[in-house]
Curated annotation (Swiss-Prot):
The gene is selD. The active site is at residue 25. Mg(2+) binds at residues 60, 100, 236. Synthesizes selenophosphate from selenide and ATP. One of its GO terms (molecular function) is selenide, water dikinase activity. It catalyses: hydrogenselenide + ATP + H2O = selenophosphate + AMP + phosphate + 2 H(+). It is an enzyme of class 2 (transferase). Disulfide bonds: none annotated. CDD domains: SelD (cd02195). It comes from Pseudomonas straminea. This is Selenide, water dikinase.
Length: 357
């Protein structure tokens, strides 16, 4: 008999994280593999004049122009459990999905649920709590959860289709950063490291609360930031880590991104866990996918390197803006409760790479 009972709760309900091989945005297909898969399509590219944002720059959402003042923002995001509490899982997944709309400078209008559950394994009241958590976030965002689709799945999967609206003149892409822009990160890093610690039963209550609080905070500032003329580009930092999404900014603008590792905000307890070698498998896959396009200072420790590739679930907005609006950007974050938003680097002329010092 297997004496390991760590995956079984007192009421014999399996831990959600024990039912999946990955969790949160760490479930993403590695960026290098994804690029290879997408490149295999033999279908000719089609041009749609009103499709303002498609797949070209790996942006956060698709944007389709309705008229000169309105465009639809459409996105979808789902994943397997990053935590064991079903209500928290639903909240985190929903917050993460809606983030893509805010990252385009949009305002959410409604959502549809994507549900895949092992119906004969998980009690139905547990599944109901996941759905309730997702709906609670939609209510917080002021939108209806208007429907969805469900399947019987081997692993638990939950997420949303998000539909939003944006003024095309205020829409922010991830490809429009300018030489000399300042980079600002809206949330602290380390979600992947904390989630890895949780799976190993090494995360204390304070660390868990910090992780859940960060991942259930809606990236609402994106809507207001898009109205600032000096904000050139927006994206959110998710499964490909800070380096991966920073590289997307660099490639889109054909510039270099320079990041100061000493200025990176991180969640409580992350530093100590990283120094113990706690990190996700996705962190290594991320580095394998884009490491050749990154230059790291030789002084960086392994723990610092792990933080840079750490997959973020419902991570912070990454803003590229002019120096003269930095104070305004930080104030928008502060007014929405993002006290740890910080200047972390800049964009500069050069090859599309990321430099970390």
């Amino acid at each position: 008999m297997n004496s390991d009972i760590s995956n079984i709760s007192l009421d014999a309900t399996p831990r959600l994280t024990s039912l999946s091989h990955g969790g949160g945005c760490g479930c993403k297909i590695a960026p290098g593999v994804l690029s290879e898969l997408l490149a295999k399509s033999n279908l000719p590219k089609q041009f749609f004049p009103d499709l303002l944002v498609g797949t070209e720059t790996a942006d956060d959402a698709a944007v389709y122009k309705i008229n000169d003042e309105q465009a639809i923002v459409a996105t979808t995001d789902f994943f397997m459990p990053i935590v064991d509490d079903p209500y928290d899982f639903g909240r985190i997944a929903a917050t993460n999905a809606l983030s893509d709309i805010y990252a385009m400078g949009g305002t959410p209008l409604m959502a549809l649920a994507i549900v895949g559950m092992p119906i004969n394994v998980l009690p139905h009241d547990v599944i109901a709590k996941i759905l309730e958590g997702g709906e609670s976030v939609c209510r917080d965002a002021g939108i209806p959860l208007a429907g969805g689709h469900s399947i019987d799945s081997v692993e638990p999967i939950y997420g949303l289709v998000g539909i939003g609206i944006v003024n095309p003149k205020q829409m922010k892409r991830n490809a429009d950063a300018k030489d000399g822009d300042v980079l600002i990160l809206g949330k602290p890093l380390g979600v992947g490291i904390l989630s890895a610690a949780l799976k190993k039963n090494l995360l204390d209550d304070a660390g868990y609360r910090a992780m859940v609080d960060a991942t259930t905070k809606l990236n609402r500032p994106g809507t207001e930031l898009a109205k600032l003329d000096g904000v050139h580009a927006l994206t959110d930092v998710t499964g490909f880590g800070l380096l991966g999404h920073g590289l997307e900014l660099a490639r889109g603008a054909q510039l270099s991104a320079r990041i100061d590792s000493a200025k990176l905000p991180m969640l409580p307890g992350v530093q100590a866990l990283a120094e113990q070698g706690i990190f996700t498998g996705a962190s290594g896959r991320n580095w394998a996918s884009y490491g050749e396009h990154v230059e790291l200072a030789s002084s960086l420790t392994d723990a610092q390197k792990a933080l840079l590739t750490d997959p973020q679930t419902s991570g912070g907005l990454l803003v590229s803006c002019t120096q003269d609006v930095v104070h305004q950007v930080l104030q928008v974050f502060a007014d929405s409760g993002f006290a740890e938003a910080a200047v972390i680097g800049r964009m500069e002329a050069g090859a599309p790479k990321v430099f970390v010092g």
